[in-house]
Amino acid sequence: MSMLCYTLIIAFLIGIWAAPKSEDNVPLGSPATSDLSDTSCAQTHEGLKTSRNTDQRHPAPKKAEDQELGSVANIIVDPKLFQKRRFQSPRVLFSTQPPPLSRDEQSVEFLDNEDTLNRNIRAKRENHPVHNQGEHSVCDSVSDWVIKTTATDIRGNMVTVMVDINRNNEVYKQYFFETKCRNPNPNPVQSECRGIDSRLWNSYCTTTQTFVRALTMEGNQASWRFIRIDTACVCVIIRKTDNF
């Protein structure tokens, strides 16, 4: 009985040893290994080629600074944004070139052009007669077209003002017509207005501001906002208490 068991065990072991080996156990250099190597190399080459093509179609993302500079340098604005504009102010101008300064005794009037965003400027005389040489202003002021990058909005927050605007593949600049005191004095006591009786009144000249609607940046979108700009130089008078 034991002899028969030994014979069956030996026959079973011989059968296992004589069975063909699988591809996983094929030694290197055999045909099966060569086929697997060729297939692996082909897949690797195809993967590299696909990755290279993907990189060409989807280039590596730029740095945040480069993206920010690019967006600021060339901001494209939808023309429909200007069609919805309300509360237009003559102190806000979009132009491809610096606007001329208004001369004394003249005011600036803007003419809208439907074809382009640029506005032509014409000067016309005031309705009131020309000042005589003996007439003087209470406070001396100066006016000029300026470019603003930041401003305070109607809520008191600092906002970014758009400078260059790309509309219909043409770059425009946003100008603001500001008026301020010519020689502002930080000490109101030593800055008296012209023609005010100093025996009864303390007076000084100061620059006042008003709100105009300007094109600003809100995140990555352009939007209209009310911002403050200098618009006049006025005289402030205070009655002296010593006279009571």
Swiss-Prot record:
Belongs to the NGF-beta family. It holds the Pfam family NGF. The lineage of its organism: Eukaryota, Metazoa, Chordata, Craniata, Vertebrata. It comes from Notechis scutatus scutatus. It is found in: Secreted. Homodimer; non-covalently linked. Disulfide bonds join C139-C205, C181-C233, C193-C235. Its main location: secreted. GO terms for molecular function: growth factor activity; lipid binding; metalloendopeptidase inhibitor activity; nerve growth factor receptor binding; toxin activity. GO terms for cellular component: axon; dendrite; extracellular space; synaptic vesicle. Residues 47-67 are annotated as: Disordered. This is Venom nerve growth factor 1. InterPro entries: Cystine-knot_cytokine, Nerve_growth_factor-like, Nerve_growth_factor-rel, Nerve_growth_factor_bsu, Nerve_growth_factor_CS, Venom_nerve_growth_factor. Residues 47-66 have a biased composition (Basic and acidic residues). Expressed by the venom gland. Residues 19-125 form a propeptide.
